[in-house]
Amino acid sequence: KPPRFTMLLSKLVPKKGKANTEFCSQYYAYKDLTKSMKRRLSSLRGVYSSDGPISITTKERVKEKGKKIKELKSTHKIIRRISSNYAIYSSPGHLVGFQPKIKNTIDLKKKLFKHQIKKKFQHSLEWEKNQLAIWDNRSMLHQATPFKGNRIMHRITIL
């Protein structure tokens, strides 16, 4: 079962406009898919790996601890129903394949990722001290933007 919600509380942040968190709504991304793409993705499960193409967190932990972390793998539906809405539930950083296996896996992954992060689905949160953000992990992609300086955040994830 995927984690449901994440809460992030900022305690120390760089200057406003630096160290933002970028969010992409996967409800809107799903709604904007063509009917044929909705059908295609609904018939597939994603194969995910903690050693995926942009597993930055894993690489940082290995660097800190000096030892390899065991790879975690999972599969789940790419299109997920949440209450009465549908969302794309796929992590560009960890998707490594599809079940059943398909031709042109790389092409479909690229097309899906490009669609998921379209500007019209995005919001950039400019952190201020003691600000709280809460989001649904099942329907929202998120990533920190690169920055210089220090940032202290307290994070809680609800399973």
Where are these regions (language model features)?
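Non-heme Fe(II) oxygenase catalytic core, chiefly the N-lobe of the double-stranded beta-helix
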Residues: K1-K129, N137-L159
